[in-house]
Every structure is written in structure tokens, then in C-alpha cells.
From Swiss-Prot:
Quaternary structure (record): Homodimer. Heterotetramer of two MnmE and two MnmG subunits.
Record-linked PANTHER family: GLUCOSE INHIBITED DIVISION PROTEIN A, PROTEIN MTO1 HOMOLOG, MITOCHONDRIAL
Compartment(s): Cytoplasm
Recorded family membership: Belongs to the MnmG family.
InterPro entries given in the database record: FAD/NAD-bd_sf, GIDA_C_N, MnmG, MnmG-rel, MnmG-rel_CS, MnmG_C, MnmG_C_subdom, MnmG_C_subdom_sf
Residue numbers binding NAD(+): 273-287
Protein name: tRNA uridine 5-carboxymethylaminomethyl modification enzyme MnmG
Amino acid sequence: MNLEQLYDVIVVGGGHAGTEAALAAARLGVKTLLLTHNIDLLGQMSCNPAIGGIGKGHLVKEIDALDGAMAKAADQAGIQFRILNASKGPAVRATRAQADRVLYRKAIRTQLQSQANLTIFQQAVDDLKIEGGLVTGVVTQMGLTLKARAVVLTVGTFLGGKIHVGMNQYAGGRAGDPPSIALSKSLRDLDLPVGRLKTGTPPRIDRRTIDFSQMVEQPGDTPVPVFSYLGTASDHPQQVSCHITHTTEATHDIIRNNLDKSPMYAGVIEGVGPRYCPSIEDKIVRFADKTSHQIFVEPEGLTTEEIYPNGISTSLPFEVQVQFVRTIKGFENAHITRPGYAIEYDYFDPRGLTSFLQTKAIPNLFFAGQINGTTGYEEAAAQGIIAGMNAALQIKGQDLWCPRRDEAYIGVLIDDLITCGTQEPYRMFTSRAEYRLLLREDNADLRLTEKGRQLGLVGDERWDSFSKKREAIESTQALLHNSWVRVHHNDLFKEALLNPMQHDCRAAEFLKRPEINYRHLLMMDDLNLPELPQEITEQIEIQNKYAGYIDRQQQEIEKLRKHENTMLPETLDYNDVVGLSSEVIQKLNRIKPTSLAQAGRISGVTPAALSLLLVHLKKSRLPV
């Protein structure tokens, strides 16, 4: 590589945020350098070998709609696929894939190495070069200075990382990898608001020492789902089952009797852990009335004997881990191949970021992933694609972009972070979105792919496939709205109809009946409806069956759009707004919301405060 090369964008970190950031920047045509401490670990799944789940699967679909890497890699590495909440409404259905770690890394690396405008270099970063309030490059561990017009930091749990097993602790970014101590210090010297968070991982078990006969088998779905809109089931490797087991009262007794050896309960760990992925110690303390907890026994891959016991994350001493693991059903003779541990790391208050994930202090420095206080591969990847894209757009002198809350779960994620901050690792759920009927997994491409194409993120293959799908949906919907189902068709549908038709109706109206699907309409030769793939007929059915609810949410969004379009100047000093409480003034001055709607989402900012802001804007003749 040319050390004198001026890169447009340097991405630091090769995890899920970093790989999406680097690919996004390169797709936009700017010269991009991805720096990682180990090229062999690009796209490494540091904890659970799985992609997707409730809320998370929605993010993966949105990343895919923007031509990101995660869904394609999950399809190529997924060894079990399931649709969660399949019996519930379409808003909360979510895809989840158990993944082979090795195949996932391979899939990500293949995408990185085949991407134009992208160079990969193995070096840890120790420092940033700052001149005139802008970042001008990075300094690596071996003293190389690499110049850049923008930098994206995606450093995961490596900043000041400290690993805990019982009362023993040592520096580490994850087991077997060194932390970024020098970079952590450099960032702290920039006076950015910093905190500490904690996460953990369970011990790994040798599959050959497990008695699966005591467990419940959990096979994947048939037909096997896919993650990517461009994917097919033929992309998947061999499919395998997971299993379910449970802790016992003996497990709980051992853990209770050893809580004094837990670094969390002994006060050794300062960082706050993830609320929705608690350690087994936390579960037993917080849910003391429960006599057992469920454990998902998940394979780590097709070429390894290691098993991931999802549900027993722990930082207890290794000898205690051995004791309690062997009280779990089917684990009586278990051999632990790797101990569980907790890891503490630095994160920076995301309220110091704009919605484009650039730091307010240094506008060409972008943060994505766990550095912003999130947890999870999917949350990291979603931030990565936005940060990398915006770094490239900034270089090109184009308007930066982030989806709104009503456009994508990515928008919900980023708005939550920059508006409310987080005191604990942030995880996405469907319940965080106000408009989740609009933000479904099945329509992520309809929501985002056209915008991705306009921005330069979406390539020709995806655009051609999407355009054909959208045309098929629109033309078929037009047919349904202009075709009639007659009363005499009652006989044709007598096996399906809960109540016979009393009058003729349009086919689109007939499809709203819960017992009727698109296949029923194909029975009517005079409609001349086309045979369509399942993903298209599903979209048509949802759009018709939920039309009233969807219209209602659209109306709510239009009402709120006025506040979204009421911009608040960055230079506005909220001390000048008459009538605001000191708490509201303090929060508004710190966060500097960009719109009246964002101000309203800040904790403690009341409707009365928003009215005062509107009055102030009008009095000051500021644009409203």
C-alpha cells in the first residue's frame, strides 16, 4: 500500500459495523481503507452465533434493502432458520438464523475482497490526527500515519476492554484479542462524554459430552426461510437442529452460594450490563421465584464440536462454572472448551452525535456500533451502513441522510440513541417503533431500496430485481381494484368462506376477508390474475388486509410531519426561550435537537415546552 495515499474514508474495526461501513463507503465510489487488528477475524461473531430475531431481523432486512452484506452472509452461513412470532401479525414476525461462525466470516470476507474502491490492511489504531477541529488521519500501532478526509470508528468492545472471570481480570477486547488501550486514552483526551458498559458470554461446551436425549429438539422451519431479498434456499448450507434444556434447583443453589465470587455482585465491575440479555447470576437473583430457566443449546458450526448454551452467560470463577453447568439437564458430563466471561469497555454518549452518526465535536469523525452504547451484531451493522454512507456523502459534498422513525427501524435506533442516549446496552425491539405496522420485515425493500439507489448504495442486480417485484405488486393491485367478485362465486369458495357474500365486491375488498388468500382468487379464471412468488402474494395480501390500519398510521405520520419539518437552529440558545424550566433548558442545550419533533422525544420536554419553543421561533422570526 502507498503510505502517502490520502484515503477518502478510513474505517477502524472489522466487525459488523466496520464491514458494513467500509462496504457502504466504497459502494458510493470513494477510496476506502478498512483497518482491522486481524484480517482473519473480519465479520467475527464474538458472542452468539446467530443473526436476527425480534426487531433485529427487521434491521437485517433494512440493511439488505440498502444492499448491505449481513443478510447475504446469513443466507450463506445459516444452518437453521426460523420465523419467530409466525402465528402473530406481520408487524412482529421476524427471521432468525443460527449461523456457522466460519462460514459467516468467509462470506463477509468474500464480499469485502470483491468490493471495488476498498483496501484492507491489518493494523490496530492507537491515535487520531486532529487538525483545525477535523480528523486528518490515524496513527497505527507500529507508528504509521494514514491520512483520510473522514474516519469511521467501529471498535466494538475493544476500547479499554477488561475481561472478568471471577475475581481475576485482564485487559482484552474479547477472549484471545488485545484491547485498544491507547486509542481509548486518545479519545478520552478529546473530552468526549464517556462511560463504561458491560456484556458477557457463556462457557462453550463440547457437543460430544452432551446427552441430547434429555433435551427437546428444536428443528428449523420448512420451507427454509431466507434473509436477503436476493437470496434463495439453495444459498443455505446443511441445516441442523438446536435443542432446549433447563437449569435445575441445584444449578441455582450453586450460583446463589457463590455470588460473592461474581465480579458484578462484588462491585468489581462498574459497567452496566444488557437488560435483555442478563447473566445467569442476574436471572437467579432477579427472578428468585423461578425454579428453572430455559437454555437454547445451539451449534457453533458444521465443522466444530463446540456448542453455545444460550442463556447462561456468566462471569463466575471457572471452577464454579464447571460445577453449575454439570447440574443442567443433559450437561452432567459436559466438558467446557472455553470459559464464560464478562467484558467491560468504553462507550461514548450517543447524544454527542448527529442523526448522521458524525460527532458534533469533530464533524468528519463518525461512530458506529458498540462505541455508541448498543449491543448486538444487527444494531452495529445498521449503524455501520449509515455511518459509512454518510462519511462518503460528506466527502462527495452531497446531503447526508438518515431514515426517519416512520421510515425504518434504523431510524428508530439512531433517533433513540441521539435523542435519549442510553445508560445500558441498547437492544432493538419492535415495541420501540411507533409505526411498526408500516415497518415490517416483508416491506423493507419497498421502504428503502429506491432511496438507496438514489444515494448510490444499491447496485444494478438488486435494483433490477426490486423493480420487477414492485411492478408485479402494483400491476396486480391495479387488477384487484378493477376486478369484481360476484355473489354467484359463493359456490366456488364455499369451502373457505366463513360467511357467504351478500353482494358483489371488488377483488381487493374480497381479499380483506381473513379466510381468503391470493391462491383463492386464482381459482377465478375470469380475473386473469398472474401466478406470483410467495413473497409478492404475501405483500399483496398484507397491503389489502391491513389497509385501514396502514392508512390510519399514515395519517398519524402526516400530522406529526409538521413538527418534523419545524427545524430548530443549531445556534439557538435555549436560555433565551422564556418560560422553559432549567431541566428542559439544560437538556435542549446539551442535545441540540434538529427539529421540534426530536425535541418532543427528549425525556422531560413537555407539550407546554414545545409550545414555548414555537412561540419563540415565531417571535424571533426564525423559520418555522
